[in-house]
Regions:
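C-terminal edge beta-strand
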Residues: 89-100
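Extracellular/luminal low-complexity segments enriched in Ser/Thr/Pro
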Residues: 65-73
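Predominantly extracytoplasmic/ectodomain segments of secreted and cell-surface proteins
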Residues: 1-28, 32-33, 100-101
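A short beta-strand micro-motif common to beta-rich folds, especially ectodomain repeats
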Residues: 75-86
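Low-complexity "stalk/linker" and mucin-like segments enriched in Ser/Thr/Pro/Ala/Gly
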Residues: 38-61
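Short glycine/proline/serine/threonine-rich loop/turn segments at secondary-structure transition edges
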Residues: 24, 72-77
Length: 102
């Protein structure tokens, strides 16, 4: 779980750089994404950026970054990110953000 203060506006990321198929030309990339947040936490914005895989290679459009604000202290929120890739694959990953006074 990732901590967040109720007053903080912070960015969190989902990195698919190791999961995307880089054996093709051009490399598979994220072409669409949806970030879903439960009531009480606010999604301020989200975007797709380049990410880095474990080999240290930059992979174009392989990471989703989302900015969150708000939340109720003592509450844990499950935030979901669904992507669609240029190869037509879909994947969903979750983050758990725990809001606490810091």
């Amino acid at each position: 779980m990732i901590p967040k203060d109720p007053e903080a506006v912070l960015d969190y990321a989902w990195n698919w750089a190791n999961w995307l198929d880089t054996s093709t030309t051009p490399n598979e990339s994220i072409i669409a994404h949806t970030v879903t947040v439960p009531s009480g936490l606010t999604l301020d914005s989200s975007t797709v950026i380049d990410g880095v895989n474990t080999a240290g290679t930059t992979i174009t459009n392989s990471q989703v970054v989302a900015w969150f604000s708000g939340g109720i202290a003592g509450t844990t929120y499950r935030v979901e990110c669904l992507i669609t890739t240029s190869a037509g694959r879909k994947d969903e990953r979750s983050l758990w953000i725990t809001v606490q006074e810091r």
